[in-house]
Structures are given as structure tokens and as C-alpha cells.
Swiss-Prot record:
Organism ancestry: Bacteria, Bacillati, Bacillota, Bacilli, Lactobacillales
Family in the record: Belongs to the aspartate/ornithine carbamoyltransferase superfamily. ATCase family.
Source organism, top-level taxon: Bacteria
Complex and partners: Heterododecamer (2C3:3R2) of six catalytic PyrB chains organized as two trimers (C3), and six regulatory PyrI chains organized as three dimers (R2).
SUPFAM superfamilies: Aspartate/ornithine carbamoyltransferase
Stated role: Catalyzes the condensation of carbamoyl phosphate and aspartate to form carbamoyl aspartate and inorganic phosphate, the committed step in the de novo pyrimidine nucleotide biosynthesis pathway.
Official protein name in the record: Aspartate carbamoyltransferase catalytic subunit
Organism expressing this protein natively: Streptococcus mutans serotype c (strain ATCC 700610 / UA159)
UniProt-annotated binding residues for L-aspartate: K87, R172, R224
GO MF annotation, one: amino acid binding
Pathway: Pyrimidine metabolism; UMP biosynthesis via de novo pathway; (S)-dihydroorotate from bicarbonate: step 2/3
Keywords, comma-separated and alphabetical: Pyrimidine biosynthesis, Transferase
Amino acid sequence: MVVTDGVVSLKHLVSMEILSNEEVLGLIKRGLAFKEKKVTFSLDRQYFAANLFFEASTRTHKSFEVAEKKLGLDVIEFDAKTSSVNKGETLYDTILTMSALGVDICVVRHSQDDYYKELIDSRTIQTSIVNGGDGSGQHPSQCLLDLMTIYDEFASFENLKIAIAGDITHSRVAKSNMQILKRLGAQIYFAGPKEWYSSEFDVYGKYVAIDDIINQIDVMMLLRVQHERHDGKESFSKKAYHQHYGLTEERYKQLKSSAIIMHPAPVNRDVEIADSLVEAPKSRIVAQMKNGVFVRMAILEAILRGKT
């Protein structure tokens, strides 16, 4: 990984842990430059990208596709339901095939934690891997668009009070964000059901009751309740969750005037956040979606630069 004149070069992007603070800020600023149309990018040859999503996705999948097309890449269609995966082909062999076909970048989402390790360690696979989410592990591109949204608002992370609230244990978004936000100087608070929190996160922040900090925080980062990872074992109703842990209209009124609300989406309305607040003045949920395209352009550009 290299940063030259503020522009990042990468071979892969599989985890936030592999990025230095300089690289993180470089990608954020490059994303903002794309957003503000201050830079252009041209390819030196034909490049191919494939988006391999083995879990459901709307925002990540389609924003990567838009980003790829904006940069001029040829996007290869892939549908897991009609691929040889249904004949028993492994993920490794699927990516090996893509590499053999000359695909330059594979964006992959998979239910297996750390699926990418055998791919980036392979001596045969030449395609670059961008992690679009691995199980309950990491989601680096979502993290970077979250960081871009915060940076665009506050121009710094130092001493910002950020609450990460909800289904923390099952959230790859939370795990990616807590690590890098702590490193960038933010103060992290965790809120939500105790059963969805682990003491391993104590090194990044403090577990608190949401009502104890609601009037102090700069960023309220809400997390989706991941029903698909609970096996139907939730101990409370959607209504009870909203009342005890969600962003209700009453809690919204207690937020600082400068505070912003974030959510990686999809949103469970009237669960994590009141339906009326999804597009409220303090909400940056739509801004996050928009920023996703531009920061993913920065990620893809960094990988393409790593190939030259």
C-alpha cells in the first residue's frame, strides 16, 4: 500500500485493519474530490470487475456497480443462484475462474468470516479482492463511506463523541467502525441490548445506557437488528426494542443541534429508528448512500493504481 501526493494505491481491500490513518484519510478525501467533481480518472487499458454477492445486498452491490461504470470499467454479471456454486463449486474455485478469465477486481460478499484470507494468500489468483462484507467480520467500504460522511460534516474525528447503538455483536459495520474511529481520535460509546454486546469491545469504547448520553453525542450511529443471524431467538418484540434502545422522537429532541444520525441500512423502521426520523433534518442516511458511490470510486481507483 502506497500514498503518493494524497492518492492511495492498494492491491486488495479486505479489512480496515490493513489501512494506515494516512490511507484512510486519503481515500476519504479522494471520495470527496470525486463527489465535488474536482478530479477525473481515465483508464490506460480495458479493465474488468465482477461483483460476487452470496448474501443479499442492494446498496453495496449497486453502488459498487455504479462506481465501476463511472470509472469506465467493464462489469461482469454474476448471479450466485445460476452459477456453478449450485453444483458444489467452492468460493476459491469461483474466484480462481474469474482470475483465469482476466477479471481485474472481484468485489465479494460472503457469509463466511474471513473468507478472503485464502484468496489473497493464493499464488495463482491474480485478481484483486474487495471485501463487500464477510459474515459478522468486516465491511471496509461501508466503514469508509461512514467516515466520509462524518468527515464531510465535522472535518475531523478528534474528540467527536460517537454512539454505536444496536446489534453490535453481529454487526460487521460496528466492528469496522469502532476500530478505526478509536484510532482517529473519536470517543466511542456503545448502547443497545446487553446480550448483543461483548466485553471484547471495551478496548474501543464504553458501554452505556442510550438515555445517559443522548444529549452529549455528535454522531448517533444506529445498527440494523440482524434477524437473519439470530435464528429467531430475539428476547423482545420490535416495539419493545424501539422503546428501550431505538431512536424515538423523544430521544431525537434531546440530541445536540449539531448532532447527526447515521444508519448503514436497510432500516427497520420503527425498530432502530422512528419512521418519521429516517429523513429528518439531522439524518444523514441518504447522504451515506450517495457517499457510498464516491468512496467506492476512490477504493476502485486505488486498486487500479496498484496494478500500474
